[in-house]
Amino acid sequence: MRQSYLKNAALLTGSDVVLRLAGMGLRIWLANELGGEGMGLYQLVLAVYSLFITLATAGVSVAATRLMAEELSGPASARGAARGMLRRLLAAGLVLGLFAAALQLATADLAARLWLGDVRAVGALRVSALGMPWMAVSAVLRGFFIARRHVAPNVFSQLTEQTVRIALVALALTRTEGLAVGVRCMLVLGATAVSEAVSALCMLAFYRRDARSAFAGQKAVRPADPARRLWEILWPVEGGRVLASALHTAENMLVPACLAVYLINAGGRTVALEQYGELKGMALPLLTFPFGLLGSLSVLLMPEITQAHILGQTKRLNALLDRMLRLTGYFSVLAGVLFWVWGRPLAQLLYQSADAGFYLETLAPAMPLMYLESMVDGAMKGVGEQKAAFRYSVWDSILRIGGVVALLPRFGMKGFLAVILLSSLYTCAANTGHLLFSSGTQHAFRRWLGAPALAAVLAAAAGMALRKLLADGFAARLPLQLAALGIGGCATTGVFLLAAWPLGLGEEAAALWAAHRPGRPKK
C-alpha cells in the first residue's frame, strides 16, 4: 500500500512539475507574441472564463470524487449501483457544462462591453464557451479515477491536453502575425477549447478500458437516494465557489478600469491594460510557479494531517503541522530571495520588460506569506475547517475590491501592489491563526520564518554581490545571459541551503525522508 501511495505521489508531483513548466513556457511565449496590451486583454478574458469554468465543474468534480468513493467502497455485489451513480454524475456534469456554455455565449457581448469595457474580447469569450461541456465530463471522470486511486489516466489526459494546446496555439499565432490582438486572443482560447475536447476523449477512452473491472461487469442500477446525495454536495460547493470566483472576476474587471482613471493623461485604457498584463500575465505566473514544487510535500503530508485529525491524535497532528509550516517557510523564503535578487534580470531576459522586473522585486518579500497561506488553506480543509477558510477568502476578496477602488485611481499600479501585499498578510495571518487555534498547535514563528529569514539575509547579500560581478553577462547575448542567471541562482540557493541546514532544515529533511522512505513498514 505504501509503495503504491509513494508511486502515485511521485507520478502526480512529476507530472505537475512538467505541466507547470510547459504552461510557464507557453505563457512566456504568449507574452512575447501578444505584448503587454495583448496579455492584459487575455487576462481579462480569463477572468470571465474562469467564472463559467467554476460553474461548469466545481461542484460536480467534488461530488464525483466523494460519491464514487462511497459507492466503490461497498461490496463487489453492489458495483451496479456505482455504475448507476456515475451515469447520473455524467448527466449532471453535461447539464452544468451545457448551461455554462449557453450562458457564456449569451452574455459574451454584454460581458465584453459592460464588464470588461473592451469589445475585442467578444470573440474570445464566445469560442472559449465551446469547451465547457468537455470540461464538465472530464471533471466527473477525473473524480471517478481519483476514487479508484488510479492517477495515470488523469496524468496522461492532462499531458495530452497541454501538448495539443501548445501545438495549436503555436500554429495559430505563427500564422497570424500582424492581425488584431482580439483575433489572436480568440485563436488562443479556441485552441484551449479544442484541447479540452481532446482531454475529455482521452478520459472516456480510459474509462471504457477500466469500466469492466471497476464495476465487475454489472449493469447500471439505481443507487440509494442519488438525487439527494448529489444535491447535498453540489449546491454548497457550487454556490460557495461560484461566489468566490465572481468576486475574483469583479476584482480583475475593476483593476484596468481604475488604472485607466489614474492614467487618464498618460495613455489611459491602453497603458492600463498593458500594465495589468505585465503584472497578471507576466510577473505573477513567475512568482506562483515554484509553488508547484511544494506539491510533493502536500501530497505526503495532507493525508496524514487528515488521518491524525480524524483519529484524535493531537500530538501527531501538531507535529505534522509544525513540519509543514517549517518546510514551507524555508522553501518560500528561498523563492522570495531568488526573485528579489534575480527578478529584474529574469524579467528582462524572458519579457524584455523593466516593469515586470519591478513587480517581481516588489512582491518577492510577500512570497512566504503567499505560500504559507496556500499550504495552510489545504491543511484547514484537511482538519474540517473549510468553512472558515472560505469565510476568510470571501472577506479577502471584498477587502481587495475595496482596496482597488480606493487606491488605484489615486496611486495607480503602486496602489495595486499595496493591495496584494496587504491581502497576503491578512489571509496568511487569519488562516494560520485559525488553524493553530483549532488544532491546539503552539506557534513557533522563530522556527517557521525566523530561521529561514536569517539564512535569507546571508543568501541575499551573497546574491547581490554576485549580481554586480555578473552585470556584464546580463548585457551580453542570450547564452551568456542564461549562464549568468543560472550561476547566480545556483550560487544564491547554495548559500541559502548552507546557512539554513544547521538552523533546522537538515533536521526536517531527514525526518521527512525517514517517515516516507520506500520500504518503511507502515505503522
Label the model's feature ranges.
Residues 87-114, 318-369, 401-402:
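Alpha-helical transmembrane segments of multi-pass membrane transport and lipid-handling proteins
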Residues 97-242, 246:
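Hydrophobic transmembrane helix module of multi-pass membrane transport proteins
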